[in-house]
Amino acid sequence: MARIKGGLNAKKKHNKVLKLAKGYRGARSKQYRVAKQSVMRALTSAFAGRKERKRQFRQLWIARINAAARMNGLSYSKFMYGLKLAEVSVNRKMLAELAVNDAEGFKALVEVAKSKLA
């Protein structure tokens, strides 16, 4: 049986990596060995970035809720505790949306929280 060389597979693999490295500067987009390292690092950073994005958005929502709650005379922690006592289950993303886009609706929630705290 004839020996089968892996040239075609190697070429496909190299082209796949070089395609991912398109736009990188210098040897990073031209040479397979350097491009492979850069692509691996980029993919690792992209994976970490997708996890980081979730944390950053939660931080942003909390900051917005805190600012709006303080404008209505309540701290973030007391506001959230008041909502918990009132058995209002609205997630932080929606609370932040209310704080930014519907000040009156948010104020009503603050009043509900205040009444349960008192």
Swiss-Prot record:
Swiss-Prot/TrEMBL keywords: Ribonucleoprotein, Ribosomal protein, RNA-binding, rRNA-binding
Source organism superkingdom: Bacteria
Gene Ontology biological-process entries: ribosomal large subunit assembly; translation
A GO term for molecular function: structural constituent of ribosome
GO cellular component: ribonucleoprotein complex; ribosome
A family per Pfam: Ribosomal_L20
InterPro entries xrefs: Ribosomal_bL20, RIBOSOMAL_L20_CS, Ribosomal_protein_bL20_C
PANTHER family attached to this UniProt entry: 39S RIBOSOMAL PROTEIN L20 (PTHR10986)
Family statement drawn from the similarity comment of this UniProt entry: Belongs to the bacterial ribosomal protein bL20 family.
Function: Binds directly to 23S ribosomal RNA and is necessary for the in vitro assembly process of the 50S ribosomal subunit. It is not involved in the protein synthesizing functions of that subunit.
Protein name: Large ribosomal subunit protein bL20
Organism field: Lachnoclostridium phytofermentans (strain ATCC 700394 / DSM 18823 / ISDg) (Clostridium phytofermentans)
Lineage: Bacteria, Bacillati, Bacillota, Clostridia, Lachnospirales
Originating gene: rplT
